[in-house]
């Protein structure tokens, strides 16, 4: 494994093309694009190096933002995630070594580096690496079309992008039916896809509302999230009963008091009957 992922000369040799951070780094913007005056590395330059470096190069080249809460699935191909897990496993081995944890003789730490890598890529941050779930829309234009409010309760698992601590909670998604309807399970799938990445609860509520509006063409959408945060429970203030609530209201949910009241009345009813 060490040999396979040995540092590539592109990044460590003065005789080869070099990665130029001031042209391709975090300060790259549309106002300062990469120019042909700089010798740009092609994809073949990365064939023997780290795949993660190649993907990062392409995103910087395209001025594609790749923050902890951004989806980057357009830059991944079949088999890429497994190779990225291999590379992250190697990096986690270094982290464990720096923490002075004996990975060789401690039976509980053997394989931990790979378990961490798989957990990040396949579970906690899977929403970054997977395309948005398919949400087939059906026309809502028959004579007896539904024009009322729909409220869906979705359980969420997310991760705080500051300390990489778990966030667990519930989202209540309200929508006034428009011209398109999606399956009930799709609301939860979309919400969970938005949640499984590094994010803030305030951003997550906005993300869910935006994706629901896009999938349904609805303009009247409400999202209410209540969650507990590991960064408050496991560190810092150690507040084990801490609860955070965020609300995003679009269209009539924001401008019409009766719609807003109906939404929160529905939430209260669901909370009263929800499993405990």
List each language-model region with its residue ranges.
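Compositionally biased intrinsically disordered regions enriched in polar/charged residues
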Residues: 1-3
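A domain-level signal for the structural core that forms small-molecule/cofactor-binding pockets
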Residues: 5-276
